[in-house]
């Protein structure tokens, strides 16, 4: 079959935005390889928003009359309605979301008017901008979900009150701590994740629109006006960097991977705590599953999936970094591969976080079991050593004396508190009966009242500070969203 020699026909048939310098159309194999609509179609709302801003910029520069501008904006509104309703979807012939939407616009506005929209912009600056818009919107969604998770953990910490649990290092009994202190220890990494999202947004708040393919545009379009219209604070300082940089995507993928790691660490503990051997927690029926063969099973699937999906998030980051590491400036087609990993990370967390928060909010803690295990494993040994230090024994000697005491108790199969006064004196004359004052988990916890310690008074202060910090971060996020919306509304008015 003879291929058409009309380049506009070839481009239209292929759903591509190029073709004039080619004698023939692309091979079916190349078309299949190049097609990206199966993942970039979700950028369609952002593409249309960008087209509106671009149409206004073209009109301001004199490339569209007032009537053409109005007709173009109406056509874009119709295009958006068709996308939302599903009346317009990407076809097999469409190379990417840009080509599919241009095809849809041509059907609505006609080729004469619709064909004017492409002036002064490239897919290179388009896609760099649209990805930022998508990520910024989803950063706000994930931010709100993380706040809900921190709120759920903080509520559990408040409900725990003075409940004591065994604190561990190396997964071995270490020192008794408040359950609330332990739960709050999982809140602070998530707060830092919230801060990272806010920090990231400050760097993402730059519009590459106007950078063209790499060198900018000769048409005199106001890139700053487009940036404001799309909710950005400013335009890219360098057009090459604007089209080629993907560090903002990689950084976002890192933040999401770090969130995944923080969830995975908590998940590992919940999985352990849910075993018979620990017996610290009971999962809600609504947030656990059973076995297809073992009727007694109640499995911590959400925690296990969170632990598993953290590897997926790390893999997405690693793959993205590997793609970026050897690219010369400016744009390269390799950058098509930036979207699937980060889109997958976004979608993974947006499904995972609500389920994870529900699991946390409905956990029931067996505080009696925790209190029973808290003094085991000679977890009060450090209290004995520090008591000796307070009585003017050098810590090196205190450490040695306490170690001998532990050895004696261990050999008899008893706890430190079960040793007699004679046993204490036999180990060291410094171990007088008054040392028993520290051989209780309540006394141990209460004595650790330095800043950041596990004493109840410090934990209550810590929780109050956490609530304050989260409220501040929530307010900052809300204010940033309002500023973006106001700037966009003002620019498009």
Curated annotation (Swiss-Prot):
<dbReference type="InterPro" id="IPR024083">
    <property type="entry name" value="Fumarase/histidase_N"/>
</dbReference>
<comment type="pathway">
    <text>Amino-acid biosynthesis; L-arginine biosynthesis; L-arginine from L-ornithine and carbamoyl phosphate: step 3/3.</text>
</comment>
<dbReference type="GO" id="GO:0042450">
    <property type="term" value="P:arginine biosynthetic process via ornithine"/>
</dbReference>
<dbReference type="InterPro" id="IPR029419">
    <property type="entry name" value="Arg_succ_lyase_C"/>
</dbReference>
<dbReference type="GO" id="GO:0006526">
    <property type="term" value="P:L-arginine biosynthetic process"/>
</dbReference>
<dbReference type="InterPro" id="IPR022761">
    <property type="entry name" value="Fumarate_lyase_N"/>
</dbReference>
<keyword id="KW-0028">Amino-acid biosynthesis</keyword>
<protein>
    <recommendedName>
        <fullName>Argininosuccinate lyase</fullName>
        <ecNumber>4.3.2.1</ecNumber>
    </recommendedName>
</protein>
<keyword id="KW-0055">Arginine biosynthesis</keyword>
<dbReference type="InterPro" id="IPR008948">
    <property type="entry name" value="L-Aspartase-like"/>
</dbReference>
<dbReference type="Pfam" id="PF14698">
    <property type="entry name" value="ASL_C2"/>
</dbReference>
<comment type="similarity">
    <text>Belongs to the lyase 1 family. Argininosuccinate lyase subfamily.</text>
</comment>
<dbReference type="InterPro" id="IPR009049">
    <property type="entry name" value="Argininosuccinate_lyase"/>
</dbReference>
<keyword id="KW-0456">Lyase</keyword>
<dbReference type="InterPro" id="IPR000362">
    <property type="entry name" value="Fumarate_lyase_fam"/>
</dbReference>
<dbReference type="InterPro" id="IPR020557">
    <property type="entry name" value="Fumarate_lyase_CS"/>
</dbReference>
<dbReference type="GO" id="GO:0005829">
    <property type="term" value="C:cytosol"/>
</dbReference>
<keyword id="KW-0963">Cytoplasm</keyword>
<dbReference type="Pfam" id="PF00206">
    <property type="entry name" value="Lyase_1"/>
</dbReference>
<dbReference type="GO" id="GO:0004056">
    <property type="term" value="F:argininosuccinate lyase activity"/>
</dbReference>
């Amino acid at each position: 079959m003879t291929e058409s020699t009309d380049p506009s026909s070839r481009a239209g048939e292929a759903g591509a935005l190029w073709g004039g310098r080619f004698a023939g159309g692309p091979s079916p194999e190349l078309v299949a390889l190049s097609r990206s609509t199966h993942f970039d179609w979700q950028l369609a709302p952002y593409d249309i928003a960008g087209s509106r801003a671009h149409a206004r910029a073209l009109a301001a520069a004199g490339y569209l009359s007032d009537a053409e501008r109005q007709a173009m904006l109406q056509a874009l509104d119709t295009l958006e309605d068709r996308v939302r309703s599903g009346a317009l979807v990407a076809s097999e012939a469409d190379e990417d979301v840009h080509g599919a939407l241009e095809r849809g616009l041509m059907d609505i506005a006609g080729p004469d008017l619709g064909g004017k929209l492409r002036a002064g912009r490239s897919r290179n600056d388009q896609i760099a901008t649209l990805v930022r818009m998508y990520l910024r919107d989803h950063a706000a969604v994930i931010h709100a979900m993380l706040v809900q998770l921190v709120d759920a953990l903080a509520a559990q910490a408040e409900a725990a009150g003075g409940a004591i649990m065994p604190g561990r290092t190396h997964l071995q009994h270490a020192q008794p701590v408040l359950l609330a202190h332990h739960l709050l220890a999982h809140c602070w990494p998530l707060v830092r994740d919230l801060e990272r999202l806010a920090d990231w947004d400050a760097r993402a708040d730059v519009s590459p629109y106007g950078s063209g393919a790499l060198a900018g545009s000769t048409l005199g379009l106001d890139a700053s006006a487009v940036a404001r219209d799309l909710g950005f604070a400013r335009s890219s300082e360098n057009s090459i960097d604007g089209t080629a940089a993907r560090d903002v995507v990689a950084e976002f993928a890192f933040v999401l991977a770090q969130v995944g790691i923080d969830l995975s660490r908590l998940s590992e503990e919940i999985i352990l705590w849910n075993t018979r051997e620990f017996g610290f927690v009971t999962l809600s029926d609504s947030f656990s599953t059973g076995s297809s063969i073992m009727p007694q099973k109640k499995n911590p699937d959400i925690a296990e999936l969170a632990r598993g999906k953290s590897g997926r998030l790390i893999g997405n980051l690693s793959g993205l970094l590997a793609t970026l590491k050897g690219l010369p400036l400016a744009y390269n087609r390799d950058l098509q591969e930036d979207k699937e990993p980060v889109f997958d990370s976004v979608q993974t967390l947006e499904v995972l976080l609500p389920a994870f928060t529900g699991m946390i909010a409905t956990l029931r803690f067996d505080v009696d079991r925790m209190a029973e295990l808290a003094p085991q494993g000679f977890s009060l040994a450090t209290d004995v050593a520090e008591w000796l230090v307070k009585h003017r024994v050098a810590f090196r000697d205190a450490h040695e004396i306490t170690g001998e005491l532990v050895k004696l108790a261990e050999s008899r199969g008893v706890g430190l508190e079960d040793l007699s006064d004679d046993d204490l004196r036999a180990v060291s004359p410094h171990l007088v009966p008054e040392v028993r004052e520290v051989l209780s988990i309540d006394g141990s916890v209460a004595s650790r009242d330095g800043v950041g310690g596990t004493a109840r008074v410090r934990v209550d202060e810590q929780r109050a500070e956490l609530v304050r910090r989260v409220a501040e971060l929530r307010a900052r996020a809300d204010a940033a969203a309002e500023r973006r919306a106001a700037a966009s509304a003002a620019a498009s008015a």
